[in-house]
């Protein structure tokens, strides 16, 4: 039995025991309360996949029986089984106390009347009351922005209007009756979260869907006099009206009123009382449906509005109608009090007396008197007026099919006939609003956008690109999309990049999977243009992706660019959705790259070379070393460390004859022709990325946990080691750390160093010979002391040398313009054996910015001093060449710890390193807030050399660079490290 089945079986027993112990049963609310009191936790609805208590009990027909009552309440009673029949019979024989009965009745009354009512509602008639126009206007105003869940309705209403919704004072018993009374403007849709209240779409949209069916025409059955009263004695010829049974069904009955009012009364008197009431109700419904919203306005108010508009024969701007009305009649005209959302909806309802036009050059609609003839300029051939519904059009106009036929499909000579018929009887047929054909397209799109587009949808925003990486930065990467070795896209693999992208995609899937949200964020046709940022769902994997429209292929398909993965694909227009603004904070994760220091053997890459490169990349994380940027394209070295031997891609391509290794990066031709990322995105704001700061994550600089510089190599040292070590790639390097290397709140290196370089650098980098010239004394305000080693090689065939390869510490000192002196001390080492540590991790102290490296060197012929030296560096960076190191503090093991240290000038450093037992590099804390850096070299390294990592935290793990070092057995855990004090 699974865990879910066990929980469900236990829940069935608990619910049966609760309901059996209650003779009169419990309501769903009381059941939830009793369960909480008995068990101490709420009903496990979500665990079992239920949305409500009623859904849970309905799924237990053998445990619970549901007993609905006439007042709307529901009582749940238990169905006893074989083991509980005796208990149920005993409970049934109990005497019911009056106190319990009265409390149950009070509970039912409170459920029926709702939370907003605590007093007894007086008795009323059979029919529910009519919702006041002011209340209906408030409901429309509340739902105009976005749909609201019924459970959140009370909070939203209080937040919007500052008071609770007291539906009892309007004569309603429940919110259900309120929604029924407002069914003409509010629709209720059942969702997974509950009942969702939505504002109904305009009648024009419903008519465009084909309602009423068959193109039946509706005309007003009762003629309205000029004063607004109905004529009861005059006959009405051939007037029709229908009985709409529901909002979505077509009319089923067509009653022909062809006789006088007296004959109708005689005919209806033969029917029984029920049929009379039904017929009268249907008649009223039909008349109200045909009159439209304008029928609720009093005739006097209509006359006043018409009088105001008639004073402006050239047209009155619709925005000035309320002000002119107040000036003339000294009273305010409030559309909301009349039940309308705004003045446009009010004018649309009064289309039997008003006419609306939109002219080029005008920023607003013009309102005219319906009986006044339009001015001659409006009758020109270029400005043909067409009928269009605005806001809430009246229902007593011609159907959509008839309007389309008379305005678009009919010849121009027949187009004036319906106009003449309508002008003869302005009070019978409500004239729809009229707009010109040649409306400014941008203005129309703007109006549609403001009305239909969600407020948090992205319209013209661009994504940011990731900030540029520093040279020699170590990153874990995924190769996402490959065109050739000179044109591919990578994605950074780290906690602050790939995991953020995964979290965002999960949130997007959860958001857009809701059908209501998906429909609301549908991308309209006029937004589908190149460069627009949106999102799309791939039907194969059901995930949602951020995309940028690249090209429109036709009526149904578009070509999109995926800024997080780099590829271009074809999708359907119907699958495009607006992207929410919250999903634009994460920068585009794809980085256009080119493999560094390689070029094809021929002019272009062969298919075999591309296939081989694809096999090397695969679907696995790789280690990348940043070389440089060429025309905005990242040139990077790639290495696969998943096997015992490190596989360098440039070496494999060269070995198989697909590429030529060169010492310079050739610009990518493919990215020169097309680089969608540079075309559709913008550069980031800087190293301290503001976007990620807003998200609450570390800055974009922390994506890579590293800041590096390249230690320059002198030409003389390059020549001295050229014969011993083959040319190749720089070794992977260590990274900067703070108090704890895994602390996400450490500051970037640039923030600590400042612009003037007034503090010692924290960088320990590998040298890259010939990459950058070493600065002279004129270029440096203070002297730099650089510890550099020979150039290391990225080659699978390279192994550490035997006993003759030792530790080389080379000191470069500037004596004059370009003069250099070298003092080298060497010790011979063997391959270090593994070291095991049994110390408790909690006893190990944390190190602050503590670095060390494995130094490849050669023994010097010069003598040595037996005492160790301590170097206090000036306020310039100290650079140390390293082998492949991890992102954690490390030190060289020493059997004997010599802590002696003296200050020495640059001239006294000439022969210090040949026999140094310990070298400590630190800064005086009195001159700055920087902590010390320590490098410990013990005499033990004359026999063997080991690279150790202190276990500063229990959750420490090796980074990408350290994995490269461990593959060569150059890295071991350090048992204990003592902090060096200045």
UniProtKB/Swiss-Prot annotation:
What is the similarity comment for this entry? Belongs to the TDRD5 family.
* Cell location: Cytoplasm
UniProt main location, coarse: cytoplasm
What's the domain of life for this entry? Eukaryota
Ranges for domain HTH OST-type come to 7-80, 127-202, 297-371
Q: Which organism is it from?
A: Ailuropoda melanoleuca (Giant panda)
Q: What does this protein do?
A: Required during spermiogenesis to participate in the repression transposable elements and prevent their mobilization, which is essential for the germline integrity. Probably acts via the piRNA metabolic process, which mediates the repression of transposable elements during meiosis by forming complexes composed of piRNAs and Piwi proteins and govern the methylation and subsequent repression of transposons. Required for chromatoid body (CB) assembly.
Question: Modified residue Phosphoserine is at which positions?
Answer: 894
Q: Which InterPro entries match?
A: LOTUS-like, OST-HTH/LOTUS_dom, SNase_OB-fold_sf, TDRD5_LOTUS_2, Tudor, Tudor_domain_containing
UniProt domain Tudor: residue ranges = 527-586
Listed SUPFAM superfamilies: Tudor/PWWP/MBT
Secretion signal, residue range per the UniProt entry: none
Give positions of region: Disordered.
816-838, 882-912
Coiled-coil segments, which residues? Answer: none
| Segments crossing the lipid bilayer | none
Of the GO CC terms on this record, one is: chromatoid body
Q: What is this protein called?
A: Tudor domain-containing protein 5
Which keywords has UniProt assigned to this entry? Cytoplasm, Developmental protein, Differentiation, Phosphoprotein, Repeat, Spermatogenesis
Which SMART domains does the entry mention? TUDOR
One BP annotation, GO: spermatid development
Return the PROSITE patterns for the record: HTH_OST (PS51644), TUDOR (PS50304)
Compositionally biased residues, Polar residues: 901-912
